[in-house]
């Protein structure tokens, strides 16, 4: 946006209400693949016992994802996306458009905020696992040498790597770190059986060092800090395979 764009208020749509909706990254990427100004899906707004329910259904021809992180893949994106409605919270939010001549036009006032979340089905769980697996791959890869290394190294009593490894092994109670993807699989499997776990039980299940396990848990879970499930862990909403009951005010 230009620093000194001209604001055009001619016919300003100050009474036009617009929605501000947060959507998953993969969904916006699939929308971008739609030809021209074609249809990307259907929005459904209904009333259920006086409450507004909104959901978005992605077109079937846009559900196929062929790459993740620039790497070839073959997975189906979730098609059903229920909305979580949120209040504007007393804020005044507006939407502007900018023309090629740097003119700004007021398009409307934000009257509703929402988050478009995927239904936690098998397609979505597989997509998230592939995304986590791709993001967990090391940037540096080992390379096989075709020549013998002849560089001479002076012998030392103990290498720094070994010293550090022994120190960590003592701190972690001699627990060895497993591959991250393997730990994720164990955690997802555990949370399919129960919604809540304390950290000690998850350590017993995965046999992983506490600090290492907590780092992985923070990626897929949240720790409850109050209520009857205080100090327990559960999956983030986007990873859950169950429906959370609505809490009464």
UniProtKB/Swiss-Prot annotation:
UniProt keywords, alphabetically: Acetylation, DNA-binding, Nucleus, Phosphoprotein, Transcription, Transcription regulation
Pfam families with a match to the protein in the record: TFIIF_beta, TFIIF_beta_N
Coiled-coil zones: none
Zinc-finger recorded as keyword: no
Entry's family note: Belongs to the TFIIF beta subunit family.
Lineage: Eukaryota, Metazoa, Chordata, Craniata, Vertebrata
Gene for this chain: GTF2F2
GO molecular function, one term: DNA binding
The keyword Heme is annotated on this UniProt entry: no
Assembly, per entry: Heterodimer of an alpha and a beta subunit. Interacts with HTATSF1 and GPBP1. Interacts with URI1. Interacts with GTF2B (via N-terminus); this interaction is inhibited in presence of GTF2F1.
SUPFAM superfamilies xref list: Rap30/74 interaction domains, Winged helix' DNA-binding domain
CDD domains according to UniProt: TFIIF_beta (cd07980)
Residues annotated with N6-acetyllysine modification: 22, 33, 137
Sites bearing Phosphoserine, chain numbering: 142, 248
Primary localisation category: nucleus
Example GO BP: transcription initiation at RNA polymerase II promoter
Name of this chain's protein: General transcription factor IIF subunit 2
Leader peptide range in chain numbering: none
Cell compartment(s), UniProt: Nucleus
One GO cellular component, as annotated: transcription factor TFIIF complex
UniProt function note: TFIIF is a general transcription initiation factor that binds to RNA polymerase II and helps to recruit it to the initiation complex in collaboration with TFIIB.
Binding-site list for DNA: 227, 229
Chain positions with N-acetylalanine modification: 2
